[in-house]
Swiss-Prot record, chains A, B, C:
CDD domains: THZ_kinase. Pathway: Cofactor biosynthesis; thiamine diphosphate biosynthesis; 4-methyl-5-(2-phosphoethyl)-thiazole from 5-(2-hydroxyethyl)-4-methylthiazole: step 1/1. It comes from the Bacteria. InterPro entries: Hyethyz_kinase, Ribokinase-like. It comes from Roseiflexus sp. (strain RS-1). This is Hydroxyethylthiazole kinase. GO terms for biological process: thiamine biosynthetic process; thiamine diphosphate biosynthetic process. Belongs to the Thz kinase family. It catalyses: 5-(2-hydroxyethyl)-4-methylthiazole + ATP = 4-methyl-5-(2-phosphooxyethyl)-thiazole + ADP + H(+). ATP binds at R123, T169. HAMAP family: Thz_kinase. Its EC number is 2.7.1.50. Catalyzes the phosphorylation of the hydroxyl group of 4-methyl-5-beta-hydroxyethylthiazole (THZ).
Amino acid sequence: MDPINQRIGDMLARIRATRPLIHHITNLVVMNDTANVTLHVGGLPVMAHDAEEVAEMVAHAGALVLNVGTLSPDWIESMLIAGRRANELQTPVVLDPVGAGATQLRTRTNLELLRSLRIAVVRGNGGEIGALSGEGGEVKGVESVSGPEDPLTAARRLAQTYHTVVALTGARDIITDGERVLTVNNGHIWLTTLTGTGCMATTMVAAFAAVERDYLLAAAGGLAMFGLAAELAAEKAHGPASFKVALFDQIYNLTPEQVANGARVVEGGS
Amino acid sequence: MDPINQRIGDMLARIRATRPLIHHITNLVVMNDTANVTLHVGGLPVMAHDAEEVAEMVAHAGALVLNVGTLSPDWIESMLIAGRRANELQTPVVLDPVGAGATQLRTRTNLELLRSLRIAVVRGNGGEIGALSGEGGEVKGVESVSGPEDPLTAARRLAQTYHTVVALTGARDIITDGERVLTVNNGHIWLTTLTGTGCMATTMVAAFAAVERDYLLAAAGGLAMFGLAAELAAEKAHGPASFKVALFDQIYNLTPEQVANGARVVEGGS
Amino acid sequence: MDPINQRIGDMLARIRATRPLIHHITNLVVMNDTANVTLHVGGLPVMAHDAEEVAEMVAHAGALVLNVGTLSPDWIESMLIAGRRANELQTPVVLDPVGAGATQLRTRTNLELLRSLRIAVVRGNGGEIGALSGEGGEVKGVESVSGPEDPLTAARRLAQTYHTVVALTGARDIITDGERVLTVNNGHIWLTTLTGTGCMATTMVAAFAAVERDYLLAAAGGLAMFGLAAELAAEKAHGPASFKVALFDQIYNLTPEQVANGARVVEGGS
C-alpha cells in the first residue's frame, strides 16, 4: 500500500480513538450539518461564538474551524480571539473563506484573518482561493463561477504569502504548502447539488488536522475520505437529499482500512 | 397544453439555464433547507445578513427573499438596506411574513417592509395574510390556526393596498395582484407536518420571479412546482422526514416538461 | 397496563388533541430539528428570541424551552424575560443546560437561570447535571465525557436545591424531583451518533409538560416516547443520517397506544 494511504488510514484511526473536540465558529446555514459530520468522522463538535467563552472553549479543542459564511462584526471579533488562543496553544486553525470575492466585507475579513492568525489550512473553492490570492476567479454568492486560470499557481501563491496550506477543492482537489503539492481525486458530482459540502469538507480537514501535524497530509486525508464517502453514497442516491443521507451514513461507516484502500491521493499537481 | 402550463415549464428551464442568485435574509430555522431548495430548483443560494454587505450582495442577485421568521432589530435594518437596493435595480423582492399576527413586532415589521419597499410577492399562510390585510385570522406561533373568512378578499385587499402580488398558501393556493387571480391546486397534506415548508415555497417563488417579470405567474409557477414535487414525494413517504428527503429529491429531479404537464393552475379564485 | 404507562399514552393523546405551542429560545445548531420534533410529536413550534417579542409570544405557549447551546448575552436577557412571563402564567419552563461545565459562561448562565426562574424540568447529560450540582463530571464541548460518580445523588441534589425536576439522560434516564425517582429504560445507542439528540429529548419533555402538571411524569413520558421511537428507528438505520430520518418518522407515527405499550418506566433509581 502507498505510504500516504496508510498514513491517511492511521489518521482516521487516531480520530476515532481520541475523539478530538472540533471547535467551530461557523455560519448559520451549515451548523447542524458540520456538527454531524464531526461526530460521524469520530470527533466531538462544539459550536460556540460568544467572545466571552471562545478562548476558554478552544483551549480544550483539537482544532478550530473559522468559517465566514454568514458574517457579522461580533463574530469576526470572536474568531480573532479564538484564533489567537489557538495559535498560542499550537492548536491548528482551519479557515473556510466562504464567499471571498463576492463582497468586499468577505474578502477583507478573510485577508485579515490570514494576516492576524497562523492558519494551518485554508480550504476554499477555486473562486475563493483565486480572489484571496489575487489570481482571479469569480464568486457568485458563495459559489465559484470560475476559478483562476491556473489553480495550482493561485493556491501556491496564497500558501506562500501566508505560510499556510491551501486546499483548493473542485472536481479534483489541489493541496499545497507552497512547495509540496498533493492532488486528491476522490469526489463525486453530487456534492455540487447540496449546500454546505465545502463547509463539510473543511470540517473533515479540521478533524484530520487535530491528529496530524503534517497539515498538507491531514488536508489530503480529510478530503480523500470525504470524497470517498461521496463516491459510495452516490450509488444509493435518488437525488441530492437521499445522497446527503447516504453521505453522512458513509462518513460514519467507513473504516480506517476502507479509507486507506480507497483514498486516491497523488503527489504533484498534474 | 394550457399556455400557463407551458410558460411555467419555460420558467423552470430558464432557472436551470441561468442559475440566478437568490439572496436570502431569512430565519435561523430554515436557512439550510431553503439554501438546498434554491440549489435543487436550479438557482444559487446565498444567505447574507450583515448591513455592511447586503447592498453589495443583492446587486448580483436575481431575487431577494426577506423572511422574518426569527426577527431581531439589526436584521430588519439589513432587510431595508437590501430591499432598497433591490428596488433600485428592479430586482424582485419576495416577502415571507412568518408569524405576522402572532406578535406586535412581527405584524409591525412586516407592514413596515410593505410600506418601505416595493415588494414583488408576499407569500404567507391564511392567518398571516389575514393579519396583514386586517381581514382577520389567527396565528399561533407561526402556524395559521384560522384564516380570514374570505381568503380571496383578504389577499386582494393586501395586494391592492401595497401594489403587490399576494400568494396565500394552504390546501389550495390563491394568488392575486388585486385584479387577476390564479389558483394552484397542487400540494399535499404532508407539507403541513414539516417545519419550514412555507419558507421553502417562498424560495421557490423567488427563483421563478428571478426569471419572469409577470410575478403573478411566477408565483403560480413556483408554488405549482413545489406542490407537484410534494405530490410525487408523498408516494415514497413513511413519515415527515422521509417525505422531506423525497421532496428535495423531486425538486431536483423534476424536468420542465414534467412541471408543465403536472401544474394544476386555474384562472380565478373559485 | 401499568398506570404510569396509561398516563403517558394519555399525555400523547392530549398533545395531539390540543397542539400546544412550544416556544423555544434555543441554539442555532438544532433549531430546525427541534422545530420538526415539536411538530411530529403533535405540538406547534415557534423559535423567537428577540427581547421585544418573547414575553408576548410565550403568553400563547404551552411550554417554554430555554436551551443555551450557542449562548450570547442578548439571548440570555431574552431567556430571562420570557422565563419570568412564563412563571407568571404558570407555563412550564424546561431548561437544557447545553455545555454546562465546559466554560464558565455556560455554567454561570445556567445557574443564573435556575436561580432567577422557576424551572419545571432541567434535562441534561451526566456531565452537565454533575457540573450544575457540584457533584463532578466532565464536559468536553457539549458532550458528557464522564458523569458524576453517583448520578442519582447529583440529580437529586440539583432538584432539591432549585425545587425542580431533573432529568439526567444517558444509557438510562434518571428523573427526580428530589424525592420521587423514575427511571426510563427506553433508548438506543444510535442516539449518541447524532448532534442535538439531547436537545430533541428536551423538546419532547416540553411537549409533555405542556399537557401534564406532574412534571416528573411528563419528563418520563417525553423521554420514554423519544427512546421508544429511537428503538424502532434503529431497525431501519444504515448509519446516523438514515437513523435520524427513521427517528423523526417514528415520532410522528407512534400512537398513544403504542407509546403506552412500549414505555419502559420504572419507579426508583436502581
